[in-house]
Amino acid sequence: MAKGQAVGINKGFITTQLEKKLQKHSAVQRKGKLGKRVALVRQVIREVTGFAPYEKRIIELIKAGSAKDSKKATKIARKRLGTHRRAKVKKALLEEAVRAQRKK
């Protein structure tokens, strides 16, 4: 916080901060967020192409339902996708797909 001093930790020109409602978000803050158009395109592609073979294997293990199979599903996903975090996200996505299939 500038106090108008020439040197030191509080050096610099004194300014007043804008209120929160007047501040604009920069484009970089939106980076990585999923837009409506991209989400729709991905959904259509998923409907047309279905699941990859490794995803089908994971779905079968999820349907089995035991803790052992759940761990094996995570291991398969991690092997294919590279990291544990990506594997967890993919497994959650496929679990949601299985739940949607059961509802129909």
Swiss-Prot record:
This is Large ribosomal subunit protein eL36. Keywords: Ribonucleoprotein, Ribosomal protein. It comes from Tetrahymena thermophila (strain SB210). InterPro entries: Ribosomal_eL36, Ribosomal_eL36_sf. Pfam families: Ribosomal_L36e. Belongs to the eukaryotic ribosomal protein eL36 family. The keyword Ligase does not apply. GO terms for biological process: translation. It comes from the Eukaryota. GO terms for molecular function: structural constituent of ribosome. One of its GO terms (cellular component) is ribosome. The lineage of its organism: Eukaryota, Sar, Alveolata, Ciliophora, Intramacronucleata.
